[in-house]
């Protein structure tokens, strides 16, 4: 892992959060390159190969954010924890930004975070401390077998962790009714819809 002063940036954009607990809130997004988890339904495959994306100085990344009217910064991927995020978070905090992480939890934690959204993947499950640190658990549901996977993960997070089931986008119309019925029977869960896709924004 590098010292984190340069990071492979796939894209940066200012938009609204579209998933989970903070849906609808304005935020600046930083998508980092590199992911070896390989989810079949991934909607950001273009981010997987880190070599395809230029390394940028963290100072330049942070400087750009000052042009936008938000105090919230979401770091996503790819799998952002492939990289040392300590320096990025330090610089964001110096600029009074709130830091949000979207991760599979498969790699060691780095960085200082105000909110961690853990989205576990079966083919590369989270490490133990990811469960301990998660503020939000978001499980992608492709079919009914994923409800048991969701419950396995729920048992590992903190009691106050927010719990979300999110339909896999290509099957959204098929799987939403199943999620609705599941939540009616298991009301500790909430549904997360990818609102940004409905709004056709990044």
Where are these regions (language model features)?
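Conserved Radical SAM active-site core
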Residues: 7-14, 26-27, 33, 38-113
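A short beta-strand-turn-helix
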Residues: 16-20
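A generic structural micro-feature
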Residues: 22-24, 131
